[in-house]
């Protein structure tokens, strides 16, 4: 079976299960994940034969998607604010509409940073993947560095495995964010300039 044949069959199966979604897009994403090839490579070399090992992997991935499992959970990753983030079933999948929250928080932060405070603190409650905290850190770190302002971004979550996941996302994106296990403010000290959730 070639890339082209698998894409057509998978897209048809996905469209039958959920006609409102674009089965072709999901099929292509699964094929990229299973083969490690880019979209361009797959489409340019669509007559490439799929070996047995990859075909078995594709069958398992497609079965999960046909059962309604979100693509992000299948891949274990979702991009948010141009940051690749690991996700798990213990976290919500970062959504594009959450970027509106990040934009608003950035607007408020930039206004407050005009006053050149020596220290600026942000708290993300129920951080999950760390998406909001990491997006804010990615934007504000360079600004604070230029202005000689100490930036502290802290994310808290109740579940220890979620805190580990958020920390791995910080490391993956080389961002300085502290993640703590806490029930809301329980293990957090001090005051914050911005609190998001």
Listing of model-derived features with the role each one plays in the protein:
Residues 100-197:
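Conserved SAM/SAH cofactor-binding pocket of Class I
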Residues 1-4, 17, 51-55, 92-96, ...:
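Short, solvent-exposed loop/helix junctions and linker helices
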């Amino acid at each position: 079976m070639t890339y082209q044949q698998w894409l057509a069959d998978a897209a048809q199966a996905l469209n039958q299960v959920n006609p409102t979604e674009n089965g072709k897009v999901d099929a292509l994403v699964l094929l990229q994940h299973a083969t490690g090839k880019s979209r361009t490579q797959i489409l340019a070399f669509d007559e490439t034969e799929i070996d047995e090992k990859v075909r078995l992997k594709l069958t398992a991935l497609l079965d999960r998607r046909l059962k309604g499992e979100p693509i992000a959970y299948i891949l274990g990753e979702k991009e948010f604010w141009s940051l690749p983030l690991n996700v798990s079933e213990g976290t919500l999948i970062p959504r594009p509409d959450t970027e509106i929250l990040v934009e608003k928080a950035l607007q408020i932060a930039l206004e407050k940073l005009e006053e050149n405070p020596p220290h600026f603190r942000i708290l993300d409650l129920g951080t999950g993947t760390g998406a909001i905290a990491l997006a804010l850190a990615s934007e504000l770190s360079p600004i604070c560095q230029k202005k000689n302002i100490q930036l502290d971004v802290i994310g808290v979550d109740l579940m220890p495995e979620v805190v580990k996941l958020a920390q791995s996302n910080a490391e993956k994106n080389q961002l300085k964010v502290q993640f703590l296990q806490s029930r809301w403010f329980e293990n957090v000290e001090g005051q914050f300039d911005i609190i998001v959730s």
